Amino acid sequence: MRTVLALMIRNRKLFFKDKGMLFTSMITPVILIVLYATFLAKVFRDSFTAAIPDMITISDKLINGTVAAQLTASLMAVSCITVTFCVNLTMVQDKANGTRKDFNVSPVSRGKIYLGYFLSTVANSLMVNGLAFVLCLGYLFEMGWYMNAADVLWVLFDMILLVLFGSTLSSIISFPLTTQGQLSAVGTIVSAGYGFICGAYMPISNFGCLLYTSPSPRDAHESRMPSSA
């Protein structure tokens, strides 16, 4: 266990040493929440208000709070998955620069080596998505806060589960990759495709029947965000 911990610390130090990767990872949630609030808020609001019958009147605060919950759930669903591909770059870098050859001839099992990569990815991703979580709570507070302490803890628990899933997914996909270009290409595909699949870029009701009826990670977040009605 001490060996795994040492490998995890080593991988985390490499992540913080690469200022470009660290800055990109930290700024991504900020950019996402600005883009979501600027461009997607109106799309979600129009989709929500269009489904309300004319004889029913709902306050703007309730509508804004519901839309903000949808946007933050979408952001967390995307960020928890895509950020892990960025912070897991150390795994591929070690293969590209030949460091893995040194590990392979050392008296350390490959299982411990990969466990060190996985744990460092989880820790770094939790740090980045923790920032996104705080920003989302601030956005909810500004638009229409309605959650209690238990709701916040459940959403935090959902975030941890998604980070574990994203770290596992990125570790599996990154396993056969040997260059940074390959990981960048995979990360781009995952970022674009996953955002649409989980309904982050547009309301799922606008999709076809297959995606409309399939559960997504965003549903888990929304299920933890009760309606203020």
State the predicted function of each range.
Residues M1-M8, L211:
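Short, membrane-interfacial amphipathic segments enriched in basic
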Residues F48-I63:
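Perimembrane loop-to-helix junctions flanking transmembrane segments
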Residues V34-V43, S174-L211:
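Transmembrane helix segments
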Residues A6, R10-L14, K101-V105:
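Short amphipathic alpha-helical coupling elements at transmembrane boundaries
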Residues Y212-A220:
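Conserved small/polar residues in nucleotide/adenosyl-binding loops
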Residues R10, L14-S47, V67-F85, L126-N129, ...:
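Hydrophobic alpha-helical transmembrane segments of multi-pass membrane transport/permease proteins
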Residues I31, N64-Y139:
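Hydrophobic alpha-helical transmembrane segments of multi-pass membrane transport proteins
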Residues R110, F118-Y194:
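Alpha-helical transmembrane segments and their short interhelical loops
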